[in-house]
């Protein structure tokens, strides 16, 4: 099959898949597929040759490739389908005016920036609802995750970065880097719709003044900056700026979803998967348990909830092939519960280990009055300070927006540090909860690295840190949350070299739990590429007739 023919068929499948999504939204269905968009049915057990848990990057790849192979597949997603307009005529709410759609069953939003000028003006009281963003709390770390069809792609900043080859090879010594960089990274970028900002427009537009100011300060320090690819459609963004398209990135939308412009998974991989006619997505269903029948069938127990969070049904599913794409937290929790409760007792002892935050630390700097960052800021980062090659202190710092509609002279960053600290998850049988052994000392390593870099920038530019952004305690470095949870079922340890879970046949992991705690860049392109590699091998060897 030629590339052009593949692209034409994929386009046709995308159209069919998008139609299925629209039909499900219009009729309020919780099950989405070309032949089966319908409300949930009271069948005792749903069976399919393959089941995918989760519809984030790894799960979406698995769903598309299974569907293309003609294998009937069910995708189980605990969040809702996000394509029905709210009372304001929009699917998602803005960052500055959050409502019930913003957070997963919370009474109040929990944004990464908690205060401004030490005032509690960022977070808002909201109604409880299966919103699009969740913040999962552990003792010394909290993790942001997306909830909905498309997972984290709905709520991230779209930065589609391929890691430095040398660091990828160090993190994945058993993976063929030539194959990854020659085949699977390009395949992932093409399917995700990765593009780059037009440099001339970037230099001239008011919407990226904040990036240019940070670039100037980095250059004065002797540091290198680099443009960062994105899955946000920059053609659409330029039309937003021109007033010929509805504003999304230029309208303050990002962490609670984008109404336009973003190529989230429901518009790419998942639309293509549904378009095959072989894939059905079940929403608002959370898998609680996995076991295996004597004949080798995997048996799943899932709770279906309504929009109040009430469990309205507990269902069982059966499948021959089971793909775990629930993310670092979701997949690890399911496997640990199965191992510790004895339903999958042969799982490897390394399940739960090797977890890290990708070295995430957020911070702000106070600029001089003449270094205005602009009242108008795009919510999509397109540039980073790249000091990763500094062996003594490797850091990649995203130049992040802080769109308030007012000039505030703040330069904001999400630093990705090479933090070698790792923690393990455990399962508490008494409370049926996942526990994380991450400590404040683990986070302190990332803080020290970020501080070392930004102390240099402040010294070169005679600037200081902002102390008013992360709560009432004058905290400079926000080290208690991560956007990039990685690990828990590490490739080559808890699995073989292709994501096959040790101890069980036809059980696979395709998500960020495969990554050993650190990538040095935003991880979703790597997760997608690794999932493509897994699916190519599994479909060639495990499902062949």
Each PLM stretch: what is its role?
Residues 1-14, 36-38:
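N-terminal secretory signal peptides
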Residues 10-27:
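N-terminal export leaders
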Residues 41-170, 175, 302, 330, ...:
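N-terminal glycine-rich phosphate/pyrophosphate-binding loop and immediately adjacent elements
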Residues 51-53, 317-327:
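Short hydrophobic core segments
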Residues 122-145, 149-156, 170, 174, ...:
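FAD cofactor-binding and catalytic pocket of flavoenzymes
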Residues 138, 174-286, 473-482, 490:
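Conserved redox-cofactor binding core of oxidoreductases
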Residues 291-316:
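Conserved beta-strand-loop-beta-strand element in the redox core of flavoprotein oxidoreductases
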Residues 451-518, 524, 528:
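A glycine-rich dinucleotide-binding beta-alpha-beta segment and adjacent secondary-structure elements
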């Amino acid at each position: 099959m030629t590339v052009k023919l593949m692209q034409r068929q994929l386009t046709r499948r995308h159209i069919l898949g998008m139609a299925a999504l629209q039909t499900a939204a219009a009729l309020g269905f919780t099950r989405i597929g070309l032949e089966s968009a319908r409300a949930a049915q009271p069948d005792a057990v749903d069976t399919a040759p393959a089941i995918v848990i989760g519809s984030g990057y790894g799960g979406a790849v698995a769903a598309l490739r299974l569907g293309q192979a003609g294998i009937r597949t069910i995708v189980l997603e605990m969040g809702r389908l996000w394509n029905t307009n709210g009372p304001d005529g929009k699917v998602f709410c803005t960052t500055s005016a959050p409502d019930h759609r913003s957070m997963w069953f919370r009474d109040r939003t929990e944004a990464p920036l908690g205060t401004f000028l030490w005032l509690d003006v960022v977070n808002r009281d909201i109604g409880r609802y299966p919103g699009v963003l969740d913040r999962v709390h552990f003792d010394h770390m909290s993790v942001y995750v997306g909830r909905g069809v498309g997972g984290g792609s709905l709520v991230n900043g779209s930065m589609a970065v391929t890691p430095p080859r040398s660091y990828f090879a160090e993190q994945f010594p058993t993976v063929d880097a030539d194959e990854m960089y020659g085949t699977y990274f390009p395949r992932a970028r093409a399917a995700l719709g990765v593009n780059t900002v037009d440099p001339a427009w970037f230099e001239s537009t008011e919407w990226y003044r904040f990036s240019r100011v940070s670039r100037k300060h980095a250059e004065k320090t002797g540091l290198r900056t680099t443009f960062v690819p994105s899955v946000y459609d920059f053609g659409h963004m330029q039309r937003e700026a021109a007033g010929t398209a509805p504003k999304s990135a230029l309208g303050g939308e990002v962490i609670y979803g984008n109404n336009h412009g973003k190529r989230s998974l429901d518009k790419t991989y998942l639309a293509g998967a549904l378009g095959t006619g072989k894939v059905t997505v079940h929403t608002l269903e959370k898998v609680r348990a996995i076991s295996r029948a004597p004949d080798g069938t995997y048996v799943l127990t899932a709770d279906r909830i309504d929009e109040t969070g009430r469990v309205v049904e507990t269902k069982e599913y059966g499948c021959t092939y089971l793909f775990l794409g629930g993310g670092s937290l979701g997949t690890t929790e399911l496997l640990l519960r199965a191992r510790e409760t004895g339903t999958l007792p042969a799982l490897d002892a390394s399940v739960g280990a090797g977890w890290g935050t990708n070295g995430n630390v957020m911070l702000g700097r106070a600029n001089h009055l003449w270094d205005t960052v602009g009242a108008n800021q795009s919510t999509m980062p397109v540039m980073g300070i790249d000091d990763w090659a500094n062996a003594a202190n490797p850091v990649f710092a995203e130049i992040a927006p802080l769109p308030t509609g007012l000039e505030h002279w703040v330069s904001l960053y999400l630093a990705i540090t090479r933090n070698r600290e790792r923690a393990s998850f455990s399962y508490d049988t008494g409370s049926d909860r996942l526990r994380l052994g991450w400590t404040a000392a683990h986070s302190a390593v990332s803080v020290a690295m970020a501080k070392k870099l930004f102390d240099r920038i402040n010294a070169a530019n005679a600037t200081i840190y902002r102390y008013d952004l992360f709560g009432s305690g004058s905290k400079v470095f926000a080290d208690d949350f991560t956007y990039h949870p990685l690990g828990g079922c590490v490739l080559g340890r808890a699995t073989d070299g292709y994501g096959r879970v040790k101890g069980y046949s036809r059980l696979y992991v395709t998500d960020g739990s495969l990554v050993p705690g650190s990538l040095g860049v935003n991880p979703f392109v790597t997760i997608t590429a690794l999932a493509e590699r897994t699916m190519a091998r599994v479909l060639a060897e495990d499902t062949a007739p």
